[in-house]
């Protein structure tokens, strides 16, 4: 027991005292001589350095994402101002598409675009010239023929191609590819009401 009493009075064998072995929130490798009174001084010194820094320039700030240059933004605005988007629906299809009427020069390119949109379920049958006359959209599974119709400003459903192209673009609200059996009653001057 004399050895244990001698160990209590003598310094520890490893040379570390209680303060050296205490767990603190300091970073690893920081000196143990730094006390809690020294940390606020360092913090104040670092804070004083940042007080003199200038704020970032207005160009360095991120305004929107993704970053788009001004000329590209303006081009997008101009394109959207000229665009005449209308919804396109197919009888029996659970989804709609949009088509830009201003991007097409006439009925034939519009019908080709409609076929391209719904190529997975529709095929083109018949064949006329390049004007799109005589072509019909046919369902691949059932064989039903579809006729392109549109709703005008007055809410009347009319056949696509019954009016001049410019008048069609101005008055079209939406396009519907109807089954030809349902579109029998549609005519250029008759309303569906």
From Swiss-Prot:
Cellular component aspect of the GO annotation: nucleus
Induction of synthesis: Not induced by auxin.
This protein's UniProt keywords: Auxin signaling pathway, Nucleus, Repressor, Transcription, Transcription regulation
Keyword Repressor tagged: yes
Start-end of Low complexity biased regions: 21-36
Compartmental location: Nucleus
Compositionally biased intervals (Basic and acidic residues): 39-53
Family: Belongs to the Aux/IAA family.
Full protein name: Auxin-responsive protein IAA23
Lineage summary: Eukaryota, Viridiplantae, Streptophyta, Embryophyta, Tracheophyta
């Amino acid at each position: 027991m004399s050895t244990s009493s001698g160990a209590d009075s003598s310094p520890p064998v490893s040379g570390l005292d209680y303060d050296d072995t205490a767990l603190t929130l300091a970073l690893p490798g920081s000196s143990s001589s730094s006390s809690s009174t020294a940390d606020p001084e360092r913090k104040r010194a670092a804070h004083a350095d940042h007080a003199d820094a200038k704020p970032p320039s207005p160009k360095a700030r991120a305004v929107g994402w993704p970053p788009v240059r001004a000329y590209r933004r303006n081009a997008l605005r101009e394109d959207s101002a000229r665009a005449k988007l209308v919804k396109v629906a197919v009888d029996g299809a659970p989804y709609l598409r949009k088509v830009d009427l201003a991007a097409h020069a006439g009925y034939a390119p519009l019908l080709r675009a409609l076929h391209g949109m719904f190529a997975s379920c529709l095929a083109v049958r018949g064949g006329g010239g390049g004007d799109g006359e005589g072509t019909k959209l046919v369902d691949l599974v059932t064989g039903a023929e579809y006729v392109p119709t549109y709703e005008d400003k007055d809410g009347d459903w009319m056949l696509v191609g019954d009016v001049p192209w410019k008048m069609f673009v101005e008055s079209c609200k939406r396009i519907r590819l109807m089954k030809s059996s349902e579109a029998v009653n549609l005519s250029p001057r008759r309303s569906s009401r």
